[in-house]
């Protein structure tokens, strides 16, 4: 099953996350199918590729709870 999940990047104490489509059995830092956004919690900043996210959701990708909250704040129907 494909999931929309956060993949951590950045320095210590300054995390940056990429929102990726990845197989649910792969580890968090594993190889992703597609990168569809960036989330920086320190500044509460998000950058999303909305058409790609909608396409993945239509094809059955399931967002994790955190990604679901990010999408709801961006007013993307989940």
UniProtKB/Swiss-Prot annotation:
Alphabetic keyword roster: Chloroplast, Plastid, Ribonucleoprotein, Ribosomal protein
GO cellular component, as recorded: chloroplast; mitochondrion; small ribosomal subunit
InterPro entries listed in its UniProt record: Ribosomal_bS16 (IPR000307), Ribosomal_bS16_CS (IPR020592), Ribosomal_bS16_dom_sf (IPR023803)
Keyword flag Lyase: no
UniProt-recorded Gene Ontology molecular function terms: structural constituent of ribosome
Localization per Swiss-Prot or TrEMBL: Plastid, Chloroplast
Main localization of the protein described in the UniProt heading: plastid
Cystine residue pairs: none
GO terms, biological process: mitochondrial translation
Family recorded in the similarity comment: Belongs to the bacterial ribosomal protein bS16 family.
The protein's name in its UniProt record: Small ribosomal subunit protein bS16c
Organism: Chara vulgaris
